[in-house]
Amino acid sequence: MKVTLIAILTCAAVLVLHTTAAEELEAESQLMEVGMPDTELEAVDEERLFECSVSCEIEKEGNKDCKKKKCKGGWKCKFNMCVKV
């Protein structure tokens, strides 16, 4: 009786874990379909990096402290670069 109960509970636990993993994969695949292609994301990342570093360099040339430009959308300026938060 105990062995059967343990087997049933083990199967139930495996089923729950498998279902959860499948749902996560499905959600990730939907996000990938809706989002931008990787090449466009790379271009956006490079643009943010360039934008942030150039703005800091311009401010340094004017003998002012570098007031880092705020990066938007989960990014912040650090070491003259936009980094993902």
Curated annotation (Swiss-Prot):
InterPro entries: Hwtx-2-like (IPR012625)
Gene Ontology molecular function: any one: toxin activity
Residue numbers covered by the propeptide annotation in the UniProt entry: 23-48
Single GO cellular component term: host cell postsynaptic membrane
Signal peptide bounds: 1-22
Superkingdom of the organism of origin: Eukaryota
SUPFAM superfamilies in UniProt: omega toxin-like
Pfam families: Toxin_20 (PF08089)
Subcellular location: Secreted
Keywords: Disulfide bond, Neurotoxin, Postsynaptic neurotoxin, Secreted, Signal, Toxin
Covalent S-S links between cysteines: C52-C66, C56-C77, C71-C82
Major localization listed first in the record, in broad terms: secreted
Tissue-wise expression: Expressed by the venom gland.
Binding partners and assembly: Monomer.
Job of this protein: Neurotoxin active on both insects and mammals.
Family of the protein in this entry: Belongs to the neurotoxin 12 (Hwtx-2) family. 02 (Hwtx-2) subfamily.
Protein name: U4-theraphotoxin-Hhn1a
